[in-house]
Amino acid sequence: QNDAYRGFLRKHYDPSPTGHDDRYCNTMMERRNMTRPCKDTNTFIHGNSDDIRAVCDDRNGEPYRNGLRRSRSPFQVTTCRHRGGSPRPPCRYRAFRANRVIVIRCRDGFPIHLEENFIPPRP
């Protein structure tokens, strides 16, 4: 595995979360070293990492604009949003759960970036 993919997993992958509430976000953001300073928004993708990797090819992905890839199937995700105030710890987050498609950038068949600001169209 390459460093960019390992970084992607550290920032955005949690296979089986212990919860999806604000406490989950506060704990995970600190555990994954995203609280110095407080990162504004971060999304954790849950499930199987092979399914996420499959977005990089045609098994579970399709081309999207600007060289990105969009998943064909939805993923369970938890998005953590900083509540505002000081960017210095302690950081307080609000959790938002969703089941949605994801948009990522891939390199050599591995996810390296999650497009945080992608909002899926309403069905």
From Swiss-Prot:
Divalent metal ions, such as Cu2+ and Zn2+, may inhibit the ribonucleolytic activity. InterPro entries: RNaseA, RNaseA-like_dom_sf, RNaseA_AS, RNaseA_domain. It is found in: Cytoplasmic vesicle, Secretory vesicle lumen; Secreted; Nucleus, Nucleolus. GO terms for cellular component: cytoplasmic vesicle; extracellular region; nucleolus. It is an enzyme of class 3 (hydrolase). The modification Pyrrolidone carboxylic acid is found at residue 1. The active site is at 12 (proton acceptor), 113 (proton donor). Its main location: cytoplasm. Glycans are attached at residue 33. Zn(2+) binds at residues 40, 82, 113. Keywords: Angiogenesis, Cytoplasmic vesicle, Developmental protein, Differentiation, Disulfide bond, DNA-binding, Endonuclease, Glycoprotein, Hydrolase, Metal-binding, Nuclease, Nucleus, Protein synthesis inhibitor, Pyrrolidone carboxylic acid, Secreted, Zinc. Disulfide bonds join 25-80, 38-91, 56-106. One of its GO terms (biological process) is angiogenesis. Serum and milk. A motif (Nucleolar localization signal) lies at residues 30-34. PROSITE patterns: RNASE_PANCREATIC. GO terms for molecular function: DNA binding; endonuclease activity; metal ion binding; RNA nuclease activity. SUPFAM superfamilies: RNase A-like. Its EC number is 3.1.27.-. PANTHER family: ANGIOGENIN-2, RIBONUCLEASE. Belongs to the pancreatic ribonuclease family. Binds tightly to placental ribonuclease inhibitor and has very low ribonuclease activity. Has potent angiogenic activity. Angiogenin induces vascularization of normal and malignant tissues. Abolishes protein synthesis by specifically hydrolyzing cellular tRNAs. This is Angiogenin-2. It comes from Bos taurus.
